[in-house]
Every structure is written in C-alpha cells, then in structure tokens.
Amino acid sequence: MRLVLVGPPGAGKGTQAEFVAAHLAVPKISTGDIFRSNVSQGTPLGVQAKRYMDAGELVPDEVTINMVRDRLAEPDAGEGFLLDGFPRTTPQAAALDKLLVDLGTALDLVLELVVDDDEVIRRLSGRRTCRGCGKVWHVEFDAPSQEGRCDRCGAELFQRDDDKPETIATRLREYADKTAPLVDYYGAQSKLVGIDATGPVEDVTVRAIDALRSYSG
C-alpha cells in the first residue's frame, strides 16, 4: 500500500506513522529523514538543500520533490511506503502524483489524523523539556515526580518556544492555510480517510488499522 499521513501539528503523526508502517510492512519515509540522509551523504541534492538551510531559507519544492523521487525509487519502496511530512501543500501533492506516474504507480490512500485546535494546544503547550538530558515530559500526560525537575537526571525543565501557546497558534494558522487544503485535494480523488486522533495512542492506532482494513477490504 502507498500511503500518505496528514494532520495538524501535535496530531501524533510521527508516532502513528511508525505503528502503521510496521503493520503494513512498508518503509516509513519522512522528509526530515530524507534531508538528513542527503545532507550527510553529500549528494548533489543534499548540497543544494544545505546551502538554503545554512542561509535560513526554505528549501525549494523542486529540490524536495527530487529527493522524494529518489527515495521512492529505491527497492524497499517498490511494494509500498508511508509518507510522513510530505506533501505539505497542494502543489507538492500534484508533483507527488506526477512523480508516481513517472514511477509507474499511484497513491492508494491518504490517512488524516483529525484533532481540534484546543486539543493540539493542550498536547503541545504541556510539554516540558529537560535542560540536562533532553527528555520531554508533559505536565498532564507524563509528569515528573517533582514539578519542574527531570526524574531521569534532576535537571531543570523548561518550555521550548515552539511549545508556547502563541507559537502553536501560529503553526495551526500555517497548517490551515497551506496543508489543510490537501484534505480537499485528496477528497476530490476519493483517496481521503479521516480518523479521530484523540485518546490513547493505542486507540488511535487501532482506528488507523481498522480504516486501512476497510479500504483494503
């Protein structure tokens, strides 16, 4: 199965991508992993991407799409894959459709993790990161035994700028402007399936697997 996972920040895409890819026995492919691999190996695309990243600029779609093309052409993706973090915009989605045609295949399904904004803010704003070991705690879901201190190393916990409500609100607006239109794009292709991504991680995984079974069956 060839699958794309979409959803707002804080929806749990990374976690669910791992479980769903393992269930399908296909590689989980994230743009972050692709970028790191190309940059560390010094590929021509990696060199281009690093130039933009070092300048604090966004990597152009053309570079990103070519990296994705190269990754999807590898043997382990021949029988299927799960894309996490790509596409993020409708132009990227159209480019993905085209490159899959060039590879002689097509996307099967787009799984949307549905979470409302209030839940996203609750999840992300509750994160606290250890200044010592980097472990991430949560004031509600995974609180340390001593408030403000890491159980693992005893160092101070702090709230990253990315986890502050005002930053989260900005990220949600960007998602609504750029990524949410993917729902309409893939809905028009009858490839979109949405699941409730609230509740325990295990419950969300069960819903995701059930949705895939319904599609396959």
Curated annotation (Swiss-Prot):
Binding positions (Zn(2+)): 130, 133, 150, 153
Keywords: ATP-binding, Cytoplasm, Kinase, Metal-binding, Nucleotide biosynthesis, Nucleotide-binding, Transferase, Zinc
GO cellular component: cytoplasm
NMP as annotated region, ranges: 30-59
Pathway: Purine metabolism; AMP biosynthesis via salvage pathway; AMP from ADP: step 1/1
Major location (coarse): cytoplasm
Gene3D superfamilies listed in its UniProt record: P-loop containing nucleotide triphosphate hydrolases
PROSITE patterns: ADENYLATE_KINASE
Molecular function in Gene Ontology: adenylate kinase activity; ATP binding; zinc ion binding
Subcellular location: Cytoplasm
Binding site for AMP: 31, 36, 57-59, 85-88, 92, 160, 171
Source species, domain of life: Bacteria
Record region (LID): 126-163
Family: Belongs to the adenylate kinase family.
NCBIfam families the UniProt entry points to: adk, PRK00279.1-2, PRK00279.1-3, PRK14527.1
Quaternary structure, from the entry: Monomer.
Domain free text: Consists of three domains, a large central CORE domain and two small peripheral domains, NMPbind and LID, which undergo movements during catalysis. The LID domain closes over the site of phosphoryl transfer upon ATP binding. Assembling and dissambling the active center during each catalytic cycle provides an effective means to prevent ATP hydrolysis. Some bacteria have evolved a zinc-coordinating structure that stabilizes the LID domain.
Name of this chain's protein: Adenylate kinase
